Amino acid sequence: MAGVILLLLSLCVGYIAYYFFRTESMNKESVRGKRVLITGSSTGLGEQIAYEFARMGAHIMITARRLQQLQEVASQCMKLGAASAHYVASDMGNLESAQSVAQEAVVKLGGLDYLVLNHIGGSGGFGFFKGDMDPVVGSTTVNFLSYVQLTSSALSALQESQGSIVVISSMSGRIGAPFTTSYCASKFALEGFYSSLRREFALQNSKMSVTVAVLGYIDTENAVKKVGNKVSMTASSKEDCAREVVKAAVLQQPEIFYPYWGIKPFVLLRDWFPGLVAKILDKCYILENIQ
C-alpha cells in the first residue's frame, strides 16, 4: 500500500511540475495563410476557435446548420484578420452532407491544413436511459460517423499538407457519465478511432498529427441550456478553452485537458480508485432536476 501511495504522489508531483513549468510556446505566424475547416462553428466553442484562427491570419471555412449565424461568424472572422472566410450550411446527421463539406472546403481553400471536428448533436436530452434507440443511433451518426466521414473525405488533402486533425472530445469519452449514455458512447468511439489513427500516422513516419481535446463543462449556450440546472459545477470559459485548443493544435500535441485540474486528476485516478472517482463525480449532479 505504501508503494502505491508513493507512486501516486510521484505522479502528482510530476504532473504538477509539467503543468507549471512547461515552456512550449506557439508561433502564431506559422498559422498565417493556413487552411482551416471548423465544424459546429456557428456558435459556442467552434465559433471561438474560428476567431482564434482568424486572428492569426488563416483561411477559414466554417460549417453548421444555421446559415445566418454562419454568415455573421464569417464576417467577424474577416474583421479579426482572417485571410479569407467561407461558410456552408450542412447537417452532419447526413453523411453525404459531411462528405460534401470536406470536399467543398478543399476546393474553396485550395487544400487543407487543419480539420477541426467540433459539432455535436443527435444524443437526445439529459436524463436516464429508458431503452429508446433513436438517441443512440442519432448520436453515433452525428458525433462519431460524421467525424470519420469528414476525416476520410479530407484525408488526401491533409496527407498532402502533412496537416492536423483536431477532435473535440469530452471527459465523458474517458470516464462513463450517467444521464448521457448515447453521448458517452460516441465520445468513447472517437477516442478509440483517433488514438488508433494517430498511431498509424506515427508508424508511417507521417508528420500528420491528431489532437484530442478532452473537455469538461464549458460555458457554451447549448451546454448551459442543457445541463445548467442539473449539475453543481461551474462552467469554464469557452474563449479560454478555444485558445488552449488552438495552441495544442498548432503545437501538434496529442491531447489537451481543459480545464486541466478539473479533468486530469480524475482520468489519472480512474483505474486506481474507480469507486472513489464515481462517488465524487456523482455528487456533481442535482438529481431532483433529472428525469
Swiss-Prot record:
<dbReference type="InterPro" id="IPR036291">
    <property type="entry name" value="NAD(P)-bd_dom_sf"/>
</dbReference>
<dbReference type="GO" id="GO:0016491">
    <property type="term" value="F:oxidoreductase activity"/>
</dbReference>
<comment type="function">
    <text>Unidirectional NADP(+)-dependent cortisol dehydrogenase (in vitro).</text>
</comment>
<comment type="similarity">
    <text>Belongs to the short-chain dehydrogenases/reductases (SDR) family.</text>
</comment>
<feature type="binding site">
    <location>
        <begin position="118"/>
        <end position="120"/>
    </location>
    <ligand>
        <name>NADP(+)</name>
    </ligand>
</feature>
<dbReference type="GO" id="GO:0043231">
    <property type="term" value="C:intracellular membrane-bounded organelle"/>
</dbReference>
<keyword id="KW-0732">Signal</keyword>
<dbReference type="Pfam" id="PF00106">
    <property type="entry name" value="adh_short"/>
</dbReference>
<dbReference type="InterPro" id="IPR020904">
    <property type="entry name" value="Sc_DH/Rdtase_CS"/>
</dbReference>
<feature type="binding site">
    <location>
        <position position="170"/>
    </location>
    <ligand>
        <name>substrate</name>
    </ligand>
</feature>
<feature type="binding site">
    <location>
        <begin position="183"/>
        <end position="187"/>
    </location>
    <ligand>
        <name>NADP(+)</name>
    </ligand>
</feature>
<keyword id="KW-0560">Oxidoreductase</keyword>
<dbReference type="InterPro" id="IPR002347">
    <property type="entry name" value="SDR_fam"/>
</dbReference>
<keyword id="KW-0964">Secreted</keyword>
<feature type="active site" description="Proton acceptor">
    <location>
        <position position="183"/>
    </location>
</feature>
<keyword id="KW-0521">NADP</keyword>
<protein>
    <recommendedName>
        <fullName>Hydroxysteroid 11-beta-dehydrogenase 1-like protein B</fullName>
        <ecNumber>1.1.1.-</ecNumber>
    </recommendedName>
</protein>
<dbReference type="GO" id="GO:0005576">
    <property type="term" value="C:extracellular region"/>
</dbReference>
<feature type="binding site">
    <location>
        <begin position="91"/>
        <end position="92"/>
    </location>
    <ligand>
        <name>NADP(+)</name>
    </ligand>
</feature>
<feature type="signal peptide">
    <location>
        <begin position="1"/>
        <end position="17"/>
    </location>
</feature>
<dbReference type="InterPro" id="IPR051253">
    <property type="entry name" value="11-beta-HSD"/>
</dbReference>
<feature type="binding site">
    <location>
        <begin position="216"/>
        <end position="222"/>
    </location>
    <ligand>
        <name>NADP(+)</name>
    </ligand>
</feature>
<feature type="binding site">
    <location>
        <begin position="40"/>
        <end position="66"/>
    </location>
    <ligand>
        <name>NADP(+)</name>
    </ligand>
</feature>
